[in-house]
Amino acid sequence: MNDKIEFIKLAWDSCIDGINSFCKGGDLKNKIPEEYSEKIFNKIIEKYSEPHRYWHNIDHLYKLIEGTLEKEFFECDYQHSKHFIMKVVLAIFYHDYVYEPEKSNNEEKSVKEMSNDFYEYLSNTFLSDVKEAILNTKNLVTKPEDGIVKYILSKLDTDIIYSSDMNELLYWENCIFKEYQIYSYSKYRDGRIKFLTKAYIETKNRKLLELVEFVNNRKPRVGLYVGSFNPFHVGHNNILKQADKLFDKVIIGVGINPDKGRKNEDYKKYLPEYREIVEYSSLVTELIKKLEEDYDVTIIRGLRNASDLEYEKNYISTLKDLTNEVKYVMILSDVEFHHVSSSMIRGLMKFTDSWKQYVIGGYK
């Protein structure tokens, strides 16, 4: 990963140096300072490194930048070619700057960030070309006559839908599935098939039809991490991260006491972001039965110590009494989290703010 970031940094520095050197007159309002450029680059890398990104991440950024080196994009003699190359590179850096899978205005938010970062340095005309290219990535297909900056960014960004390598397409599918894991599989499947069908109509790539069949028939392996999570804390998150390596997806099942309920809804803000969260107030076996309409479900139980092990063995034995088909896995938290518990945190809440070190706000 470090090699990729070094390559990406080289491309960024070359872009900024190019803008400072070649964008004379109207396009360059003020020279971009080196320290400011460094600050913006670090901010961009931080965004593309967000944990909920599996496809729209550093690797994706690297691949697009690498793609600008391909000869095919520069065979035509475009006037002021250096200017449009710099626009393409700047558009690449910002095209997925904001990526919130459940939102439909990521492109608009991304261009706003780009404009805020460069309005003091670049002309409205220069920024407008970059903005339009980023907003155009909402479309699957772009032609050269639509604008060369738009065309190159679109061609690089949608390269995967032209792939004839089924392994590559399956890797893409798994990454997108993880990015949209906030949704139930039935909802994800419907939206994904709609997108892939549209992509096939545009590209005539028959491999996409094979991918449609895969998505339609898939039954993802899911870990169901159940608990009261009142609140969800760093120890829970440690178990969750380990479980992510074992399953296609992990669903958080929040148990609600049907007699007491949850009068205080504050617990929700400590739950992880970009996850499918389900509340249940009946037997967990009923929840499993419902989820198994779409998923191959395995119960996840977290352990801190030997005392937890005895409790969990009894818990699993009870589940087996209720249904013989239950699958489960026990995951031991790392030693630095063995002392953390929700009851400890609730106790601290009464006297001090030190409890905040033990909870998370999504992935932050």
Regions found by a protein language model. Give the residues of each.
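Active-site flanking loop/helix segments enriched in acidic
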Residues: 38-67, 97-100
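His-Asp-centered metal-binding catalytic motifs of divalent-metal-dependent phosphohydrolases/nucleases
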Residues: 64, 84-101, 110, 130-138
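Carbohydrate transferase catalytic cores enriched for Leloir-type hexosyltransferases
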Residues: 104-113, 185
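Histidine-centered active-site/metal-ligand motif
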Residues: 56, 60, 95, 106, ...
